[in-house]
Amino acid sequence: MKNNQPADAISFIVDVLKKEQVIAYPTEAVFGVGCDPDSETAVKRLLELKQRPMEKGLILIAANFDQLKPYIDDAALTAEQREAVFARWPGPVTFVFPAKPSTPRWLTGRFDSLAVRVTNHPQVIALCEAFGKPLVSTSANLSGLEPCRTAQEVLAQFGDDFPVLHGATGGRQNPSEIRDALTGELFRQG
């Protein structure tokens, strides 16, 4: 891509995603790298790029809750648990839901659950809406390096040809908080 954003950046990035490639995009705090969650090829590319074991599981980021329903067992939550989740969404809080049995292991890793987030970042909302589904979302950084906070940092770490949706992060200093949707237990402070 040579660091020049095409006129229709979202369409360009969606085309890259449809080719089972990994992309970078701004999130609430840092840039993320992501791909099509339904493509084992794309997810394996992302895991290889990040040097991340599949067993750890991944996060999905979505424009709305409906995009997450194919992957999570929403029926496992009580009305009160669902209300607690929706009180924090959209926003920078990731919740771990029970996964549907059909959710691929390349997303859940060794778990029977899946971490998911409904974002309030306008570019990520537009991207997920244009793509028609959520994205895998993990911080944009190579193993041992700090997460990227700008498109320029992404290109410096991943190379000038890496497909990046240019834009600003949401300005948060910390990555998303992670909580259990069933118990409310805090796994990672945001």
From Swiss-Prot:
Membrane spanning stretches: none
Entry's EC annotation: 2.7.7.87
InterPro entries tied to this protein: DHBP_synth_RibB-like_a/b_dom (IPR017945), Sua5-like_dom (IPR006070), TC-AMP_synthase (IPR023535), TC-AMP_synthase_SUA5 (IPR050156)
Statement: the UniProt record of this protein carries the keyword Cytoplasm: yes
GO CC list: cytoplasm
Family: Belongs to the SUA5 family. TsaC subfamily.
Protein name in UniProt: Threonylcarbamoyl-AMP synthase
Species in which this protein is naturally found: Cronobacter sakazakii (strain ATCC BAA-894) (Enterobacter sakazakii)
Gene assigned in the entry: tsaC
